[in-house]
Amino acid sequence: MNRLDFVDQASLRDDIPAFSPGDTINVHVKVIEGAKERIQVFKGVVIRRQGGGIRETFTVRKESYGVGVERTFPVHSPNIDHIEVVTRGDVRRAKLYYLRELRGKKAKIKEKR
């Protein structure tokens, strides 16, 4: 192991729940406005998870007032307070980019039993 691997190991978080594409999650993000810090919740469907180790990221998509909003988060970011898994989705793909074109009921994901 080289020095970078030791730094990466020290920066990894162990409080991240297991989630995968298709799951609906709440991401509690720390937002700094001026001198104040508050928690903002971003709720949506995980459409991708990529990378590994300290560089791992995931993308969450939601509809806000009829506009699709996607946000990419590093999994081990200190700006993430915590992550809650709301529902588990039953999908057959690792990348759910096709959800970008779907609207309404067609964009619904079946829930795992």
From Swiss-Prot:
Entry keyword annotation includes Cell membrane = no
Which InterPro entries does the record associate with it?
A: Ribosomal_bL19 (IPR001857), Ribosomal_bL19_CS (IPR018257), Ribosomal_bL19_sf (IPR038657), Translation_prot_SH3-like_sf (IPR008991)
Q: Which family does it belong to?
A: Belongs to the bacterial ribosomal protein bL19 family.
Protein's job: This protein is located at the 30S-50S ribosomal subunit interface and may play a role in the structure and function of the aminoacyl-tRNA binding site.
GO terms under cellular component: cytosolic large ribosomal subunit
- What organism is listed for this UniProt entry? Mycobacterium marinum (strain ATCC BAA-535 / M)
The gene for this chain is: rplS
Supply the alphabetized keyword list.
Ribonucleoprotein, Ribosomal protein
What's this protein's name? Large ribosomal subunit protein bL19
Q: Which GO terms describe its biological process?
A: translation
The lineage's top-level taxon is: Bacteria
Which GO molecular function annotation, any one, does this entry have? structural constituent of ribosome
Gene3D superfamilies to which the protein is assigned, alphabetical? 2.30.30.790
Q: Which PANTHER family match?
A: LARGE RIBOSOMAL SUBUNIT PROTEIN BL19M (PTHR15680:SF9), RIBOSOMAL PROTEIN L19 (PTHR15680)
